[in-house]
Structures are given as C-alpha cells and as structure tokens.
C-alpha cells in the first residue's frame, strides 16, 4: 500500500484527475517503498492546462510588478514556514539525506523566488531620443504561457528556479516535474494558490518525458520551454520546440566538469573541495567536478587525503540526522552508475575506494552505491569522457598548466570548472581559458540566486538565475512616437 494518496494533476488552482485515468508509481529509493500512485497526464490534460494558463496569465500580467511581488513574497513565507515538511517529502522522493534537503533544497528555491519578487517591479523599458520631434520607447512584455520541464535531482528547487523569473515577468507556467520525483512540485502549486496566485498561473502536469513532456514541447500556444536534463533529451526538446512554433528555449544540460588542483594548492583544502564536488547529493549534481586534475608529483599525497575524507562519509537511512550520503535516485539509475564503474575497472583505472553497490542488511532494499574514486585514469576512458551522474571521481595527473587546461577543455561539455590555488593571478588566468559557464576559485558548488547558471558547448543554452534570466522571459516591443508633421514621399 502506498504511503500517500493517489496524486492528481494540478490545473486552475485545483487537483483534477488525468483524462486517461492512468498512473505511475513514485518509489522511495532508500527502501523500494511505493510512495504514491501518480496521475499520467495526456494530450487532453495539456490542452486544459494551456487554456487555464492563458486565462490566468491575462489576469497576472495585468497586475503591477509590485502586486505580483507581494504574492510571490507570500509564497516565499509559506515555503519557509513549511521547510521541514517539504524537506521530508523531498527526502522520501529523491533519497537525499534530510540534513541536506532541510538546509539546501527548499531554502535555496525560496531564495530565488524572493530574489525575483524583488526584481518584478524593476522590469522596465528604455526611451531612445531620435530627434527633437521623435523618440522611441521600448516595453518588456511577458511571453504568455511558458513551460518548465524539471530534472529529478533537485525537484522543488528547479521548479522554483524556472517559475520565479517567469512569474516575475508576468507569464503563466505549466510545469512538468520528472516522473522519477514528481511529488514536491504539486505541493508547490498548492502554496502558490494559497499565496494568492491567480488560478492557472502555475499548473502542474505529472507524467513521462516521452509522453506529456514531448507534447508540451510541441504545443503551438506555449511560447517557451525551460528544460533541465540530459544532452540527448535536450536536443530532442530543442528540435521539437523549433519545429512546432520556433519556441524560445533555455536548457541546463549535462556536464563533465574539471577541477584543476595546482602544485601550490593547499592539498587539505583541495581534497575537501574535490570530495564535496563529487559526493554531495550522492554525486547527482549537474555541476559536479568529476575530472580532478592533480600534478603528477602530488598524486600519492592527494590520494591519501581523499581517502581520509571518504572516511567521513556517513552512508545510511536518509531520514536519520547523522546521514550525509544517501541512495541514488532510482534502481534504474543505480544500474547505470554500476555499469560505468564496471567500465572503469575494465579499462584499467585503479580503484581507491568504493566501486560497488552497498547491500549489507537494510541497504539491500535501497539503491546505495559506495563513494568511488578511480586513479590512474586516462582521458579516453568512458568514466572520464561521459557523464555518470553518480558518486564516481576520476583522478588524472598532469605535468603543466597548459596541459591541464587543454585536457580540461577536451570535452563536449562546458557546464562548470574550478581551480584550487592561493595565487589569484594564476587562478584567474586559468579560469579565463577554461570553456565553462560556471566557474569556482578555491570553492565549489554554490549557486546563489544572483549568479547566472548555464553552460557552454553542449551543456546548455541561456541562463537561469541572476538578472540575465529575466530577459529570457520577456520580449521587447519597440514603439516610435512622432510629435511633428509626417512627411510622405507620395
């Protein structure tokens, strides 16, 4: 029997059944428990959601920026009041430790919503003088109905990252959470309604990416799609968005990010950063620094420091306060990660720790994989070239700065990168040569609301967060005004 009642769709401020009456299961990856039967949305449900969103958007866009900001801030307050309740739901659905979801997921999502609430009244156009009798002014107008398609690793945070700038600009959003972790987006929709968001301005359709997800990208009355997920799926989304109605797209896709440890680095600090950049959230973070470059002469010392820190990993029941490392998000994903680990072993990489599923006692019921470090890696190995999205660190030795930069850039991805060195001139020199959209110096992983997030190359298009994101949810209308006589050539 499922822990929660059957989960419906959320359309026009209320829960409704899916037209097909079909469902799928949401599973707790820590123990295999069925959390809920969840409605599978189809074409008729999407049409209903679009019509609802169009109605709600007209009301929402007619409000002033200050009025929209007040409602958004009420939602922020509700999110913070219910932080622990939402964190537990997120832990059950994702397998992430409660210590993590309580301190990161809802808090950082609420921060982004508050940030864009502050920007909503500041959306403005320009006045451009042409001559004494004429000028141009511009208006930043909402796109209308937009869509967000979320990933499974940060369900409510990603929903807020996409909804916040869209709502600030006066749009309505249809959001599809990942079918792997669908529960918290529905609670977010309830909170938005309670805060006073007009019906239809935030609708949630649960279901598969291949099903309702594909229908969303094709719908001619949806003006934009913001997608977070893998590169292969992102390419399909972009092709469908362009082929249907030339939709605008924002995409945050995969990564295989390099972390360069310089020869003058504090190795204790570098080891702390490397472990956080690979094992936080059980390695299921898009920006993880999975390719760690270390000077050849420091490799043995650095390996020892990494192993010291792995001893501090407390794998366990995600609901226990002491746990800081939970299961992977699903059993299917666990199998994928284990396959990559097997490929690494077969290719000749040397295992320093982990490299296997954890099956002792109660862990046999969950999707637990031990933190894994490979050394003696080469750039042509699949564990070095392909995104694993799990707790797998690949250690690569290098001889000089130019070599490290060249090899760091030798990838189809360009999401994130980092460097560890006390020499700030060197740090900036290296960072400026790295082909990545998000970079860190002597730290890793923080993505505050003010910081634009997005990738180079095949890691994405556009940006989320920061002022830059707001422009992706508006369109510019130019208006010329003539105060003098009109001179016709006819």
From Swiss-Prot:
Coiled-coil positions: none
Q: Which UniProt keywords apply?
A: Metal-binding, NAD, NADP, Oxidation, Oxidoreductase, Potassium
Report the catalytic activity. Answer: betaine aldehyde + NAD(+) + H2O = glycine betaine + NADH + 2 H(+)
How many and how are cofactors bound here? Binds 2 potassium ions per subunit.
Q: Which GO terms describe its biological process?
A: glycine betaine biosynthetic process from choline
Q: Which domain of life is it from?
A: Bacteria
Task: Give a yes or no for keyword NAD in this entry.
Answer: yes
Query: Which residue positions are annotated as catalytic?
Result: 162 (charge relay system), 252 (proton acceptor), 286 (nucleophile), 464 (charge relay system)
For activity, the cofactor(s) needed are:
K(+)
Q: In which pathway does it act?
A: Amine and polyamine biosynthesis; betaine biosynthesis via choline pathway; betaine from betaine aldehyde: step 1/1
Q: What class of enzyme is it?
A: oxidoreductase
Q: Does the keyword Oxidoreductase apply?
A: yes
Q: Where is this site: Seems to be a necessary countercharge to the potassium cations?
A: 248
Q: Which GO terms describe its molecular function?
A: betaine-aldehyde dehydrogenase (NAD+) activity; metal ion binding
Looking up NCBIfam families in the UniProt record yields: BADH (TIGR01804), PRK13252.1 (NF009725)
Q: Quote the PANTHER family the UniProt record gives.
A: ALDEHYDE DEHYDROGENASE-RELATED
Q: Which family does it belong to?
A: Belongs to the aldehyde dehydrogenase family.
Name of protein: Betaine aldehyde dehydrogenase
Q: What is the lineage of its organism?
A: Bacteria, Pseudomonadati, Pseudomonadota, Gammaproteobacteria, Pseudomonadales
